[in-house]
Amino acid sequence: KRAHALFLFLETDPIGCLHSNVDYDVPGVDDKSTFEMSSGNYTGNRVGIKGSEDLGNGMTVGFVLENGFDSDDGSFDSNEDLFGREALLYVEGDFGKVGFGRMGILNSTAGSFAIGNFTPWGTGWGAVGDQSLIFGANIGSRWDNMISYRSPEFAGVQIHAQYSFGANTTGDEVEGKTTTDRYYALGATYKNGGLNLIGIVDSINEKHAAGTEDPDDTLRVTIGGSYDFGVVKPYLSAAYFKDARMKSWMDSYNTEGKTGTLDQLKGDWDGYGVIIGASAPLVGGTAHMTIGYMDAEAQKDYVATFDPNGADLTRYTFAIGYEYPLSKRTKVYADAGYFKDEMDYNSKDWIDRDPEGYQAAVGLVHFF
């Protein structure tokens, strides 16, 4: 009886998405390529439950629990956590919305507080739509022990804020201490008719062990927007990053060394990136396109294993895609993307590395 009474006041709904695709990938190194069935290219597979309860006086408490998995083999995604995509408890009222738990960062499209719709792809569509390849600062899309806030809307403007205490206390890492990375972000959005503007500043307070030098903290500033004209929706966005962790296309900079796999993009990078794109209705579906450019410079303390004098990196990306709805909850899609890097080491002892790669995929997505 108690359980029955609880569900009279607590509205709950199952949530989920099942997605499979076939893709052809050329990472851009050693002429290797793969042709395989995979999942999560368009968007991540998930299953979960969400619910809310009206507390009266304009107050609501709710939760979201989402498990991520790979549909091609049934294995856990998101570091094999049970609710690795999102584990959120929130309170909402006239003051706005406050959430606690594991959730996506502002500068992504993952979860209840994300606002990172800077391109037609968001942060989905695999490597083709991965805006962090251009925006630098390879910050994880989801963090544990997060507090998030979203303000009420004032004349189309909303303020967003986040802080993560870092990973749970395990081994040498202690939550909320300097031994674990901590994340924070501040953002603002503006909506007026077809106009959508976004600005986000986010950073990682880098961890360091006792008695070691405090590393420079990662900083990223991202601005962008779109305008829906009906016949076409153009996008324009740009990011500045400092002391950032660079991201590579499909691990194209990983090199086998004497001590294992080495990442030639490891280190602190300063630079900027720009993405232009558009979406447009086409034959009952929607077509998307983006072009990206990034220019970055590694610090002189880069990774001594490779080049202590630093390095310069220029990156170009191009992507197209098309999605077609079969129903309100099911769609098919196809996409293709290309990237090219121009890496110049500042030491004559190293050979410049200029990977060039491709990705193409077709898939089926069903939401429930």
Predicted region positions:
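Outer-membrane beta-barrel "beta-signal"
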Residues: 355-368
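Outer membrane beta-barrel
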Residues: 1, 6-21, 34-168, 180-182, ...
